[in-house]
Regions:
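Conserved beta-strand positions in the Rossmann-like core of class I SAM-dependent methyltransferases
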Residues: 40, 154, 251
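Phosphate/diphosphate ligand-binding glycine-rich loop within oxidoreductases
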Residues: 3-120
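Glycine-rich adenosine-cofactor-binding loop
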Residues: 14, 103-108, 115, 119, ...
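Adenosine-phosphate binding glycine-rich loop
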Residues: 224-226, 230-287
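Short glycine-rich anion-binding loops that position phosphate/pyrophosphate groups of nucleotides
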Residues: 66-73, 135-136, 203-206, 233
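Rossmann-like adenosine-cofactor binding region
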Residues: 175-250
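Short, conserved loop/helix-junction motifs that constitute active-site signature segments
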Residues: 3-6, 123-124, 147-149, 215-224
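NAD(P)-binding Rossmann-fold cofactor-contacting core
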Residues: 147-174
Length: 287
């Protein structure tokens, strides 16, 4: 990569940010396309978010990704926010459009595209079960609840009250009925029976606790039940292995990571990035 005085600057802000895969993915895409950009990581403390975004304007940085814990905090400093980002309540991409800062949420695109391309879903099933009720669940529920084919969503969470609050909020936005249950074996067995897709948005199974799994009713898994696990470290979670054991289709969190990043890249550059190159560079980091 040759960085010149004319190079457009892209980046990611977070606290911490050293663990981010985004510089690897985006710089690989930049190299593959041969365009005059570079992508760097900025460690921004929570109390400096507003200053960082003023710097984005002042330095004419083309765009930023936003990671934990700033996805909500940046919103008050933006000039415009997309409909999806407002619905999800979080911004993970900022575009500097001639001095106007516009916030987007590309996780929604990442969820849908990962399921279509990586899981091979030609049509979304009418019944979907989502495990968890945190920030990742919100993006997933909005993405799937916005699909015409999906008629019923069920949220399972260890804290039922949190799931109820999310369901009430997202029912108003999506217009879809959302039922709620406790994340336990009995409820999984009951809800998995009629579902065509299960999405894990919990951190269970994430490195370093790779032996954990949110699957408590293994007997309820069948070969027609698609799993989408948003965890991407490790690349193959224990839950994914449990579904594979019965011949069920699975999709891991790496695909969402790549596709949400690809959508950000499109917003900033107007170009379609090579997602195979972006995915390969992340896989190599795990090797």
């Amino acid at each position: 990569m040759n960085i010149r005085a004319t190079s457009g600057v892209l980046g990611v802000i977070g606290h911490p940010v050293a663990h981010s895969f985004s510089p690897d993915m985006h710089n690989a895409a930049i190299d593959a396309l041969g365009i005059d950009f570079c992508y760097v990581a900025f460690h921004v403390l929570p109390e400096r978010v507003g200053e960082a975004l003023q710097g984005l304007k002042g330095l004419n940085i083309r765009g930023l990704n936003v990671t934990i814990p700033h996805k909500l905090a940046v919103m008050e400093h933006l000039d415009r926010i997309s409909e999806e980002a407002l619905a999800v309540g979080a911004v993970n991409t900022i575009s500097n459009e001639e001095g106007e800062l516009v916030g987007y949420n590309t996780d929604v695109y990442g969820v849908v595209t990962a399921l279509e391309r990586a899981a091979g879903l030609e049509a979304f099933p009418p019944q979907v079960v989502v495990l968890g009720a945190g920030g990742a669940a919100r993006a997933v529920v909005y993405a799937l609840g916005s699909r015409r084919e999906v008629g019923q969503l069920t949220l399972l969470n260890r804290t039922v009250e949190r799931a109820e609050a999310l369901a009430l909020d997202m029912e108003k936005i999506t217009g879809k009925p959302i039922s709620v249950g406790r994340l336990d074996a009995d409820t999984q067995a009951r809800t998995f029976a009629g579902a065509g897709l299960v999405v894990n948005t919990t951190s269970l199974g994430m490195h370093p606790n790779v032996e954990e799994t949110p699957l408590m009713a293994e007997g309820a898994v069948h070969s027609q039940l698609v799993l989408y696990d948003t965890v991407f470290n490790p690349l193959e979670t224990r839950m994914m292995a449990q579904f594979r054991d019965v011949g069920a289709p699975v999709c891991g969190g790496l695909d969402m990571l790549v596709y949400q990043g690809a959508r950000s890249f499109q917003i900033w550059t107007g170009m379609e990035p090579p997602t195979d190159v972006m995915k390969e560079v992340v896989v190599r980091r795990f090797a």
